[in-house]
């Protein structure tokens, strides 16, 4: 599969971010392991932001006035067109770092999890309903394990 990732670093402190190749590896794993495994080409934007920007976007698009770890904006092909665009991912660096520390995970493991999690949202996966959450979390765990990471939900299962 040919993957094009437009990585936009829009956070004030770009230190300790994963390498672009890592984001590409995690995103490709999600696409190939998810509902789009037949896809030959995919294109998406990953924007790494600070809390202010994600809070503004969360309020604007979800009417929720607080930060979140990720926002996913899937692209809808117009009728008659089949473009390789998946959409846009917005990931908040500060929230990812805070969650990793709080959950006792390595920063790299949590970046991988958030990259896979948000890409799956672009592919139509969700976790609002219990059955959907189980399906999505199971797939995330499978993909992360295949990439050498531990189950991101292990502490919740204990």
From Swiss-Prot:
EC number(s) stated in the UniProt entry for this protein: 3.1.-.-
Organism of this sequence: Psychromonas ingrahamii (strain DSM 17664 / CCUG 51855 / 37)
Purpose of the protein: Single strand-specific metallo-endoribonuclease involved in late-stage 70S ribosome quality control and in maturation of the 3' terminus of the 16S rRNA.
Cofactor note: Binds 1 zinc ion.
One MF annotation (Gene Ontology) recorded for this entry: metalloendopeptidase activity
A Pfam family per the record: YbeY
Lineage, broadest ranks: Bacteria, Pseudomonadati, Pseudomonadota, Gammaproteobacteria, Alteromonadales
GO cellular component: a single term: cytoplasm
Protein name as catalogued: Endoribonuclease YbeY
Location (main, coarse): cytoplasm
Stated family: Belongs to the endoribonuclease YbeY family.
InterPro entries: MetalPrtase_cat_dom_sf_prd, YbeY, YbeY_CS
Alphabetic keyword roster: Cytoplasm, Endonuclease, Hydrolase, Metal-binding, Nuclease, Ribosome biogenesis, rRNA processing, Zinc
Chain sites annotated for binding Zn(2+): 117, 121, 127
């Amino acid at each position: 599969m040919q993957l094009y990732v437009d990585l936009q670093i829009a956070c004030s402190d770009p230190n300790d971010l994963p390498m672009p190749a890592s984001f590409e590896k995690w995103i490709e794993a999600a696409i190939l392991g998810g509902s789009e495994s037949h896809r030959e080409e995919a294109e998406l934007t990953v924007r790494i932001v600070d809390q202010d920007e994600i809070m503004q976007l969360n309020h604007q698009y979800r009417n929720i006035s607080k930060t979140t770890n990720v926002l996913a904006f899937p692209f809808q092909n117009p009728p008659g067109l089949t473009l390789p665009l998946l959409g846009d991912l917005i990931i908040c660096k500060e929230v990812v770092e805070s969650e990793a520390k709080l959950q006792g995970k390595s920063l790299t493991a949590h970046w991988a999890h958030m990259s896979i999690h948000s890409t799956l949202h672009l592919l139509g996966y969700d976790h609002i309903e219990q059955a959907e959450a189980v399906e999505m979390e199971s797939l995330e765990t499978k993909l992360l394990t295949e990439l050498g990471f531990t189950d991101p939900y292990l502490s919740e299962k204990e």
